[in-house]
Amino acid sequence: MDSSAVPTNASNCTDALAHSSCSPARSPGSWVNLSHLDGNLSDPCGPNRTDLGGRDSLCPPTGSPSMITAITIMALYSIVCVVGLFGNFLVMYVIVRYTKMKTATNIYIFNLALADALVTSTLPFQSVNYLMGTWPFGTILCKIVISIDYYNMSTSIFTLCTMSVDRYIAVCHPVKALDFRTPRNAKIINVCNWILSSAIGLPVMFMATTKYRQGSIDCTLTFSHPSWYWENLLKICVFIFAFIMPVLIITVCYGLMILRLKSVRMLSGSKEKDRNLRRITRMVLVVVAVFIICWTPIHIYVIIKALVTIPETTFQTVSWHFCIALGYTNSCLNPVLYAFLDEDFKRCFREFCIPTSSNIEQQNSTRIRQNTRDHPSTANTVDRTNHQLENLEAETAPLP
């Protein structure tokens, strides 16, 4: 979701917001580099405005749609960055900190939070790129930021697909779930998801580079000749393998789960277990639905742009920015969903934000027990010393 996909024929103009020259079509990115891939988008402030039927209104002075869009995007990116980093790191902390949170489902949630935290950490770089109209951070960071975008997109959807299959096994095959749904297996599957995402992320990292154009620097993707073929091939492969196929698998899994939940009143023989099973299934479904809602517009937009030519208007530019920002917004929504939909997460978040005396005592006792396990010889020595002191006091005590 980087902001560098731009037409090569654009020149500089006076940017009403940054008071400096602005280079071509920098979509403030999301699908990274779907803004990179979608190189036909032009900056409404660029010289291409003369190609829009003379409608110079795309680059008016202060108060223009471009300035309003820029301010809105910067404000949204700031909120997403702060909420996303804090929320996702908090999710990872409570999963690592509390033993009761180390379930198979939460291990997958940890992976999702890690991917979201990584992508929100790139937003400051993309904001600077958008405001300055150039990429000042060098080629290495260009490669890192673009590849993180693709890694986040693919790892997130693969993890959600895994969570849906995991829920399907838990609901429809509870006996098999006992052997399969373990934290250890969940960790292995998480690693496999990152390896699978590398099929997209690593090629993108190698293709990402910086280019000098019209006095500015673009962080963009380069394709072998013929570039249009490889560019469209990447778009289509990402759309099919990192969106359509996972969404189909998720849909099938939840369709089968709904049929199972409707046909069976008692899944596990325990009302409490059934309640927890349905609650977790509902939470995963909501997280998946929100992801699809946030990411569908940008995927559809990019595919449409690959197939047909869309006239460049203010509405087209604003809608592009909106689709990109919507994809990023998903990265900060998941922690909020966990807090509202899962009692365990809600309780852990509350304990972290508002620690009570009982929680502090419990943490201290847990730490003492951990130290005792880590240093048994020291603990035994202390016990023996205390026992000897008690005996000495008993022996030296005056008789009544």
UniProtKB/Swiss-Prot annotation:
The keyword Lipoprotein is assigned to this record: yes
Residues with lipidation of kind S-palmitoyl cysteine: 353
One GO cellular component term noted in the UniProt record for this chain: neuron projection
Post-translational note: Phosphorylated. Differentially phosphorylated in basal and agonist-induced conditions. Agonist-mediated phosphorylation modulates receptor internalization. Phosphorylated by GRK2 in a agonist-dependent manner. Phosphorylation at Tyr-168 requires receptor activation, is dependent on non-receptor protein tyrosine kinase Src and results in a decrease in agonist efficacy by reducing G-protein coupling efficiency. Phosphorylated on tyrosine residues; the phosphorylation is involved in agonist-induced G-protein-independent receptor down-regulation. Ubiquitinated. A basal ubiquitination seems not to be related to degradation. Ubiquitination is increased upon formation of OPRM1:OPRD1 oligomers leading to proteasomal degradation; the ubiquitination is diminished by RTP4.
Membrane topology, record value: Multi-pass membrane protein
Gene3D superfamilies xref list: Rhodopsin 7-helix transmembrane proteins (1.20.1070.10)
Pfam hit, one: 7tm_1
Location of Phosphoserine modifications: 365, 377
Record's protein name: Mu-type opioid receptor
